């Protein structure tokens, strides 16, 4: 993007930093990882977990959720003011899995939020370390993106389930800050705005009074974040229109859905970061690795190297395939739910299959599931190559895509052409070109019509051997274009609903 100079890098967003040079950024991200690792080690001690139990991803998720809940001030305030039966607003907890007499047992633990906050701050040199909390939120969000398809949420807001490649970060909490905003897809931003406009239509006081002023500034801020993700002038102009509307209503919803559809071909820039579970950082820290001193980046080789040397385990339900569970978590670790599967297969070195072909449910285990025949197995999270994460949508072009997902949102900066199914996308653009935004609409449609299949994105960029830490020898992959490129291909993934 042309305006790169005015943007803070992800790592600065991640660490609330002022302008820092590369070394300082690597150190401050490393410091954040150290803090998560130290916290995790301390929690494993508190919970008396064995080394194996501490490397169980389900335990990691529970511990991460406990600290996120302990620091969720708005929800904590709400719980204090609206006490509900059987829920102690001052406590947090969840299922912890232990190996007892050769069987996996579930144990529900409960801790004072105050105590969890104390352990977290102590692990982070007394700071609240918001960046570390956001990092865990993004890991949970990436896992949700890989596990569930947001069909229902899309339909509810009047969008099309085939637009799922725009929905990165749709389950991120609002309090996830600048780092969270950076990883949200176009569809996620559009959905948040549509929900807001619908509330305004149904509730006369939504935009009024003292609260209404705050609401209005939140609305305009979200419009600006979305505008900043678009890469063409016409799409940005359309966002200005939506933002400046006196009284946002159905016309704005129409414009937003139009711009979301257009993003299937004229893709926006969405950041990608490899956020790993806390049970990866903990053992690395306890083995004596100093992330702050060595430096760390979420968008380079570091997460790949870390995963090459990590042992992570997962509980496996009786009819699940451990290799499929591994693929799910591997994709989540690299924020790659909407990347082209052919490229992922190349980087990973083993075939990456569409969601509907995987015999695995989500990673988390519901409290009513029977533990009797639960097994556990090692997650295979290693890769054959590594590649640099991108925050650009790549330039656009087309190719046969699938019935389920009709476009991709690239994760890796690697040369390829980006598949989307032009006829399907363009079919949605018949009709309505009148009204205030008619000239922008016409311009956007013209650009989409002009998108060429043979165009290559990320020209000259390649993947790298894991020994090539300085990224000196790019290997430009060649793909079998007959293979399916979309993950949510005509899919039957469970829907994510809170």
Swiss-Prot record:
Keyword Transit peptide in record: no
InterPro entries on file: Flu_NP (IPR002141)
Locus of motif Bipartite nuclear localization signal: 198-216
Example of a GO biological process term: viral penetration into host nucleus
Signal sequence range: none
Sequence motif Unconventional nuclear localization signal, residues: 1-18
Pfam families per record: Flu_NP
Post-translational modification: Late in virus-infected cells, may be cleaved from a 56-kDa protein to a 53-kDa protein by a cellular caspase. This cleavage might be a marker for the onset of apoptosis in infected cells or have a specific function in virus host interaction.
Record GO terms (molecular function): RNA binding; structural molecule activity
Region described as Disordered: 1-21
Subcellular location: Virion; Host nucleus
Keywords: Capsid protein, Helical capsid protein, Host nucleus, Host-virus interaction, Ribonucleoprotein, RNA-binding, Viral nucleoprotein, Viral penetration into host nucleus, Virion, Virus entry into host cell
A GO CC term assigned to this protein in UniProt: viral nucleocapsid
Record bears the keyword Signal: no
Stretches with biased composition (Basic and acidic residues): 8-21
Subunit record text: Homomultimerizes to form the nucleocapsid. May bind host exportin-1/XPO1. Binds to viral genomic RNA. Protein-RNA contacts are mediated by a combination of electrostatic interactions between positively charged residues and the phosphate backbone and planar interactions between aromatic side chains and bases.
Protein's job: Encapsidates the negative strand viral RNA, protecting it from nucleases. The encapsidated genomic RNA is termed the ribonucleoprotein (RNP) and serves as template for transcription and replication. The RNP needs to be localized in the host nucleus to start an infectious cycle, but is too large to diffuse through the nuclear pore complex. NP comprises at least 2 nuclear localization signals that are responsible for the active RNP import into the nucleus through cellular importin alpha/beta pathway.
Family, as annotated: Belongs to the influenza viruses nucleoprotein family.
Protein name, as recorded: Nucleoprotein
Species of the source: Influenza A virus (strain A/Memphis/4/1980 H3N2)
